Amino acid sequence: MPKLQGFEFWSRTLGGARHVVAPMVDQSELAWRLLSRRHGAQLCYTPMLHAQVFVRDANYRKENLYCDVCPEDRPLIVQFCANDPEVFVQAALLAQDYCDAIDLNLGCPQMIAKRGHYGAFLQEEWDLLQRMILLAHERLSVPVTCKIRVFPEIDKTVRYAQMLEKAGCQLLTVHGRTKEQKGPMAGTASWEHIKAVRKAVGIPVFANGNIQCLQDVERCIQDTGVQGVMSAEGNLHNPALFEGRSPAVWELAEEYLDIVRQHPCPLSYVRAHLFKLWHHTLQVHQQLREELAKVKTLEGVAAVSQALKLRCQEDMSRQQEGVRPADNLPAFHWICQPYIRPGPREGSKENSGGRSKRALEEEEGSMEGLSKNKLKKQLRNPHKTFDPSLKPKYAKCDQCGNPKGNRCVFNLCRGCCKKRAFRETADCPGHGLLFKTKLEKSLAWKGTQPGLQEAQQVRPVTPSGFSEVVGSALA
């Protein structure tokens, strides 16, 4: 069967998908994809896979793709990060029989992508991207797609998209933020950029960004003219987003746990999903947050889910008519709803009106107001002091400024002490360095071995550079 392209690929292979679950590292695993498909998702992406590791490691391929084969999990697009055309194509060839298309990640803005030189940090290397897409388009039996972020300039974003289309990209997902817009600085995605790209290319376009409910999906399609809308954060907080429903948080949690029992995944994935799904409820019942963080088994997670369900039902029974949700939430905490990420100014020290936590610790010498991580450490180590005023003060090394050993005979740190003791053939019992003692023992032992002494005695060297002993041996 010939490889379908562009709109024919979108309409026939992908079934004209409009509701799409984004590729999310450690989050869009098989169990979550199946849950999302049950609630309106028409197309899913795998988590981003590292192309080089996928080619090199058979276990990585097995754990991240080959063991996750499920007839219900189609259509499916496998996403790779890569910066080498040959490696990208080799990985894609190994994956193409398990999916409907291969996607190249050109949108990841995280520091790990910068260090690895992939994702959004390739967006200025157009020649490299052209070679990667062209080679994949020529050699794969399935279409190649791309997920990108925008440039600040609309015209440059349009030229970028047209370059990828010309190289062989058959479907383009446009995240309407720049690579600098992330975390607290995420801001609002630009649908104007997405609209301009959609008008300028002749392939299907998916929009990504600012999608928190079904109304956002419909408005985005209407405003930009895209073929589909991709959701990441919104999907994590409400997997029923594409149905236009906001069910109780425990309802979707129980359904997800049932799927995980059939299609197991690492417990860290499960825990991360429930932290997102229960975000607002865990602000109210913080003890459950601690319990969820501690459990080590799926049964333990299910027990926490049951406890959360009972707490929420108690809150519902006490809820009085006419009372609005707390903290300006659009719905009560037990209802699936979007999470609005605080802006950079909301959490800044300038607006907090207080001093840093470390300064307060040093002044008060108390554990109040510390982070949960430090409180956990205190519980695990009850005899350890966290009061800075009680911590021992270390004198500095005379040479490098690092803390010196309290019992060092040279008043140095271990590194400097080792160099000096070796140079002077001296001992430092404080650091356990016994160069002098070991040398004396070695000489004393050799003195008791007359045969060894004779073997080590070398005769005068001949003009040719070899000792007479060596010369006679070669004769």
From Swiss-Prot:
The keyword tRNA processing applies. FMN binds at residues 23-25, 79, 147, 175, 208-210, 232-233. It is an enzyme of class 1 (oxidoreductase). Keywords: Cytoplasm, Flavoprotein, FMN, NAD, NADP, Nucleus, Oxidoreductase, tRNA processing. The keyword Transmembrane helix does not apply. One of its GO terms (cellular component) is nucleus. One of its GO terms (biological process) is tRNA dihydrouridine synthesis. Its EC number is 1.3.1.88. The active site is at 108 (proton donor). One of its GO terms (molecular function) is flavin adenine dinucleotide binding. It is found in: Cytoplasm; Nucleus. Pfam families: Dus. Its main location: cytoplasm. Its cofactor is FMN. Coiled coil: none annotated. Residues 373-383 have a biased composition (Basic residues). Residues 343-388 are annotated as: Disordered. It catalyses: 5,6-dihydrouridine(16) in tRNA + NADP(+) = uridine(16) in tRNA + NADPH + H(+); 5,6-dihydrouridine(16) in tRNA + NAD(+) = uridine(16) in tRNA + NADH + H(+); 5,6-dihydrouridine(17) in tRNA + NAD(+) = uridine(17) in tRNA + NADH + H(+); 5,6-dihydrouridine(17) in tRNA + NADP(+) = uridine(17) in tRNA + NADPH + H(+). Gene3D superfamilies: Aldolase class I (3.20.20.70). InterPro entries: Aldolase_TIM, DUS-like_FMN-bd, tRNA_hU_synthase_CS. PANTHER family: TRNA-DIHYDROURIDINE SYNTHASE, TRNA-DIHYDROURIDINE(16_17) SYNTHASE [NAD(P)(+)]-LIKE. Catalyzes the synthesis of dihydrouridine, a modified base found in the D-loop of most tRNAs. Specifically modifies U16 and U17 in cytoplasmic tRNAs. Affects the level of some mature tRNA and thereby the total cellular translation. Belongs to the Dus family. Dus1 subfamily. This is tRNA-dihydrouridine(16/17) synthase [NAD(P)(+)]-like.
